[in-house]
Amino acid sequence: MSTATIQDEDIKFQRENWEMIRSHVSPIISNLTMDNLQESHRDLFQVNILIGRNIICKNVVDFTLNKQNGRLIPALSALIALLNSDIPDIGETLAKELMLMFVQQFNRKDYVSCGNILQCLSILFLYDVIHEIVILQILLLLLEKNSLRLVIAVMKICGWKLALVSKKTHDMIWEKLRYILQTQELSSTLRESLETLFEIRQKDYKSGSQGLFILDPTSYTVHTHSYIVSDEDEANKELGNFEKCENFNELTMAFDTLRQKLLINNTSDTNEGSNSQLQIYDMTSTNDVEFKKKIYLVLKSSLSGDEAAHKLLKLKIANNLKKSVVDIIIKSSLQESTFSKFYSILSERMITFHRSWQTAYNETFEQNYTQDIEDYETDQLRILGKFWGHLISYEFLPMDCLKIIKLTEEESCPQGRIFIKFLFQELVNELGLDELQLRLNSSKLDGMFPLEGDAEHIRYSINFFTAIGLGLLTEDMRSRLTIIQEVEDAEEEEKKLREEEELEKLRKKARESQPTQGPKIHESRLFLQKDTRENSRSRSPFTVETRKRARSRTPPRGSRNHRNRSRTPPARRQRHR
């Protein structure tokens, strides 16, 4: 058989295979819904989609351009993310083709098709299939052309993720939108849509990713693709058409290996509950260091919190080691100069994956506050407070975990009080005072917000929260303290009255006993005075003689009539006269 004949037979065989793949793939994608997503993903692997990857890309683009499929775009995006995990070429091709198709439809002013494509690209950005540079190119183009409706649609879906990975550009876009809202004359509908978007941002995009399919991190590998549009690039019009495959046999062997791997994974997932075995780790000092080093390298090599969570969960860490992993995550976050939401998003994914991770985070929080708090510096306390405040505000950790804190001068240290300050400031920033007050009322945090017991404890707590600018949280304590003080004042007044009554009784007893003792005392005094007078009168002769002898020896004076009383000689006196 000649070479030309062999080549013709080969092309014929490949064409028949291509037709079979196309007839199998097209109905699966055209009938795709969120309910049959996983089943559709499995069905695609019944044919060699390594050879037919362009067929899948063509069907995805056509599905997106169909104006009636707007509500099914989330399911399509999830399917692309699953396929990209196994075959990254599909994600790379679709990132380019969807971007070029958007530019083409935008120039044609087909805004419905543009909306579908943007929805798909935005969700793929959330799944880390495409890089943020793709979304930023689109947003800058839309702002330049003043296509505000499409900008609003994109920001509603992926604005929260854009704020995490490219904060400066995110803020620049918002400043541009604020300027447009304040300076330009807009229709009432468009103005209302913009105001709604600003309200969503104020709530930190809490409803941004609702309704999306949650990918299993243990079986999902992240491959992120970027593409920069140039003026010369155009969408591939031949996408999905038959082309001879030069490496047909190699792709066939590679697909068999891939399908076998997927079958093994599915079988292990199915039998995991019945055939699971306890994983044993040798945690000697050497292996402990290696284990921590491995976790640390996973964190530092990840571009996003979602990617880090996927890598960590893929390790299938035993329950007794999860607390160590959480401790490494927190220590890594404290090495940053400021608080990074990378670690909070990572923690969100870990906690929601299994309740054993929530237990590990609860135990680590208790250890941070009760044992390690005095070892942290002020900047680290700020990061630590924001980290735990974020998890508590979004209810990944319950408010009851704060029950271990008792806010008194004796049972709290300065570092602990600084930590509480930053934690509550983060709670207020995330929830607002009103929502925080409602949550505190539903949780009995007697250690920080006491309503019973010692008045000094209540007073200290009031003074603390007032000093950090959260005095509104202390209204119940203030009312309770007023009641306690009134009760204490009444008890003190009653005590004084009892003391005065006792003192009055003692005085009364003293007055009653005074008349019986008074005359005896008086008579005894008279007796002593009389005895003293008699003793002074009845002196003995010996005493009189003694007194006479004791008189002065000065010569006796003469009579008062004697003229010469002076001792001056008479003659001298006469001369003087």
Swiss-Prot record:
Which GO cellular component does the record give, naming just one? Prp19 complex
Q: Which residues form the MI domain?
A: 290-407
Where does it localize?
Cytoplasm; Nucleus
Kindly state which keywords UniProt assigns to this record, in alphabetical order: Cytoplasm, mRNA processing, mRNA splicing, Nucleus, Spliceosome
Q: Which SUPFAM superfamilies match?
A: ARM repeat
Cite a single GO BP annotation: mRNA splicing, via spliceosome
What ranges does the record list as Basic residues composition bias? 548-577
Reading the lineage from the top rank, the first entry is Eukaryota
Regions of biased composition (Basic and acidic residues) lie at: 520-537
Kindly give the Pfam families that the UniProt entry links to this protein. Answer: MA3
Coiled coil: which residue ranges? Answer: none
Annotated MIF4G domain residues? 22-204
GO molecular-function terms, A-Z: RNA binding
The principal localisation class reads cytoplasm
Question: Quick check: keyword Ribonucleoprotein in the entry?
Answer: no
Q: Does the keyword Oxidoreductase apply?
A: no
Chain intervals for the UniProt region annotation (Disordered): 505-577
The family classification in the record reads: Belongs to the CWC22 family.
Q: What else is known?
A: Present with 3260 molecules/cell in log phase SD medium.
What does the function comment of this entry state? May be involved in pre-mRNA splicing.
Summarize subunit and interaction data from the UniProt record for this chain: Belongs to the CWC complex (or CEF1-associated complex), a spliceosome subcomplex composed of the U2, U5 and U6 snRNAs and at least BUD13, BUD31, BRR2, CDC40, CEF1, CLF1, CUS1, CWC2, CWC15, CWC21, CWC22, CWC23, CWC24, CWC25, CWC27, ECM2, HSH155, IST3, ISY1, LEA1, MSL1, NTC20, PRP8, PRP9, PRP11, PRP19, PRP21, PRP22, PRP45, PRP46, SLU7, SMB1, SMD1, SMD2, SMD3, SMX2, SMX3, SNT309, SNU114, SPP2, SYF1, SYF2, RSE1 and YJU2.
The name on file for this protein is Pre-mRNA-splicing factor CWC22
Q: Name the source organism.
A: Saccharomyces cerevisiae (strain ATCC 204508 / S288c)
